[in-house]
């Protein structure tokens, strides 16, 4: 069972050895990510110059389970739209929060604006 849900920003911090990577490592065992956020990671890695195969290999090496974004999650994410609109949270952000809500585990991110939302289980890694 998943123990934490990673946002794309936390995965990218790990892969790029950015500030917060050491803290993110504490949550890596038992971590999962929404397929929406996994697509964000792949896009960012490919934008940085990696091939599709290289980005997939780098991501898969972390051992993070990719979770489907299904109809149970879309309604949870939709419910976060209005309360987070002023904070500028993206669909990816809301997908991560929806999965964390469904699994009742912390969401791991670098995005400080999430703390303003009042979601009780947010881990800011930097």
Where are these regions (language model features)?
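Short, well-structured N-terminal submotif of metal-dependent ribonuclease cores
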Residues: 1-33, 45-57, 126
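Active-site neighborhoods of divalent-metal-dependent phosphate/nucleic-acid chemistry enzymes
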Residues: 67-108
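Short loop->beta-strand "edge-of-pocket" segments that line small-molecule binding or catalytic clefts
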Residues: 30-33, 62-67, 106
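Short acidic-hydrophobic, aromatic-tinged amphipathic segments that line or gate anion-handling sites
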Residues: 66-70, 123-126
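Acidic, PIN/NYN-like endoribonuclease modules and their adjacent C-terminal/linker elements
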Residues: 3, 97, 101-126
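A generic structural signal for short hydrophobic patches within well-formed alpha-helices
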Residues: 11-12, 38, 114-115
């Amino acid at each position: 069972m998943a123990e934490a849900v990673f946002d794309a920003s936390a995965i990218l911090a790990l892969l790029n050895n950015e500030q917060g990577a050491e803290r993110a490592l504490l949550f890596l065992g038992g971590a999962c990510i929404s397929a929406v956020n996994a697509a964000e990671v792949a896009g960012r890695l490919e934008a940085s110059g990696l091939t599709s195969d290289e980005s997939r290999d780098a991501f898969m090496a972390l051992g993070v389970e990719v979770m489907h974004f299904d109809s149970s999650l879309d309604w949870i994410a939709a419910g976060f739209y209005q309360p987070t609109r002023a904070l500028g949270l993206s669909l990816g952000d809301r997908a991560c929060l929806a999965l964390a809500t469904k699994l009742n585990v912390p969401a791991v991110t670098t995005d400080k604006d999430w703390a303003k939302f009042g979601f009780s289980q947010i881990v800011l890694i930097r």
